[in-house]
Amino acid sequence: MNPGNFFTELKRRNVYRAAVAYGVVAWFLTQLTTQVFPFFDIPNAAIRFVVIALALGFPIAMCLAWLYEFTPEGIVRSEDLDPITARKGRRLTGRILDFIIIGVLLLVIAMLIYQRAPSRTEAGETIPQKSIAVLPFENLSSDKENTYFADGIQEEILSKLASIADLKVISRTSTAKYKSKSEDLKTVVQQLGVANVLEGSVQKAGDKVRVNVQLIDARADTHLWAKSYDRDVKDVFAVESEVAQEIADALRAKLAPNEANLLATAPTQDSEAYDLFLRGEAEQREALSSRKPEAFDRAADWYRHAIERDPNFSLAIARLADSQMSRHWWIHSLTEKELAEVKKTAEHALKLAPNLAEGHIAVGLVFYWGYRQYDEALGEFQHALELQPNDSRALIYSAAVHRRQGQWERCLSEYQRAGQLDPREAVVPASIATTYLQLRKWKEADRAARQSLTLDTREIGGMITLLNSCLNGTGDIKEARRIMSTFPTENRITSRVWGADVVDIIGQRAYLSIIERDFPTALKIWEPGANDPVAKSELGIAARPAIHVLAGDAASTQTESEQVGGVLEAALRERPNDPNILTQLSWIYLALRRNAEALSAARQATNILPIEQDAILGPGVLTNLAEIEAHAGETEQAIKILHRLLSIPAGLEVSIARLKIDPVWDPIRNDPGFQQLLAGKEHIGP
């Protein structure tokens, strides 16, 4: 046959149209099976069978298109038709094929438009295609105590994904608030701002482990990929790497060479050391939630056991240093010697693994929380972000450092970026609220604080800021009491990191009673119970003597004040540069009528932590000095300090509305200079 005639005949018999129709339908069926089969747990082999069958069916379909035509009477062999009927049949066949092609193409276009249409978060932000949240993995082990192991697998996969710059990966602190398998994925992705979620389960029995994972396009509620892994426990690192790589491939994320290396890197080759490490991680999460010193101690013990098994386990070494710095910041300050040891530990982790993001965070915390060397801390946090672009912790710490440097706009920008990666973490809006409060932007502070408490009703920063945006912004004591009634009743609302002036020493709950001039209730709040570690700790030890001073009843607390003074003086000998101890001692000395020593302690605290070094706590420490001066007869100096505080961002402690209602200023309230402050203006903004 002449080739030209052959191709003409192919066209005449609608074979070309049939080929196009078959290709379009085959593509649609392939997409359909890859989306639907995993939903019913149909093995991947079935999908491969469909693809192979469609490929093998193509030449058969082309032969049938050559041999047969559609006619009004049905399907008939082309050779059996007379010329007129054949022409009608070919036209009918062509129309049918056109309808098939157009119909399937419309379905394909609709599917693509739906999948690619930009979704939006609750805040109205566009959700990127390459975004994912790794939901908590379900523990299917018969031993329910193996939950720590399932959590650890999830966290390690998430950590590997966080190193991919081309992906948006939600932090674990946000995903931890959801169930392993959410019934309403569309709500989840709107709240988290992602297009995809990874669900999984872990079953551990002896030295065997089964990991089931499935990647879901949550907007369309379709499965992109699913797989089961049955491995020895010692091979679990390979599973974590494979899952992360499969997800990156499924979402078409571009990997830089260093990112590919990080995905393939195992934290240790010792499975028992890894198990001990995961137990430490579980305890560390509990410690950060409860702020109980014993939880931090248990976490450190597990990390040390892991390091004993594998002395080169850099991740465990870094996390040990991180845990110790968290304890230092939230619970009890380290001595200079202890701090030097933690610094050595963190640096050792980086020496073992220079590209370990967690190591850079640990060293950064030593510089930030330990030595207040802000530039060095920022350098470490930036390095961590380069290694793990989705690490919300590094962003949060960077924002906090910039805030202490008084770089308010940059601080807020970084907190907002952190909020995109950690949208359900209450600390982020609470920190934003605190920043606005310091800037005396009361409405913005109120709004952010309420957002924080919506996420977590027990968030200390949110409670403190919401209460003080009212008291400092409007001076409305009744509204403040109403706000207080919404807080957990057992919480005195104290925080060591806020330990700057008398309000922080006494705590927000008791201090509201003081503002109401109800001193007996304030004292009752601090009655030490049989099992009350806070009242007996450095955090609350000076509260009762300080309340007696404000009540004008210092004489009744001499014995207690002498005992507390002895404890704090011993602590100061161990940690001579701790401003928290000095501010508390200043009030104890006032209670003991040792005014000169009270002034000396308060001034020493301001020298250690001036505003120039800390734009958040510095004004609070200076406020404490003004309070001590007001009670020690140094009226002129107290007013001078207050004048300065009203002219800079210091809304956490000082505002005109607060000066009008706070009993701490009663000793100088009738002074003309103080009254002039009340009639003046206050600085608002950066």
Where are these predicted regions, by residue range?
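Acidic, proline/glycine-rich low-complexity intrinsically disordered segments
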Residues: 4, 36, 90-548, 553-562, ...
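TPR/TPR-like (Sel1-like) alpha-helical repeat modules
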Residues: 485-490, 642-650, 682
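An N-terminal, helix-rich hydrophobic module
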Residues: 1-118
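Terminal, low-structured helical/coil segments at or just beyond the last alpha-helical repeat
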Residues: 657-686
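Amphipathic alpha-helical protein-interaction segments enriched in hydrophobic
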Residues: 538-540, 578-588, 614-630, 657
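Hydrophobic, well-ordered secondary-structure elements that form the walls
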Residues: 586, 626, 638, 668, ...
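Acidic-histidine catalytic/liganding microenvironments
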Residues: 13, 164, 310, 353, ...
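C-terminal structured "cap/appendage" subdomains that terminate the fold
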Residues: 629-660
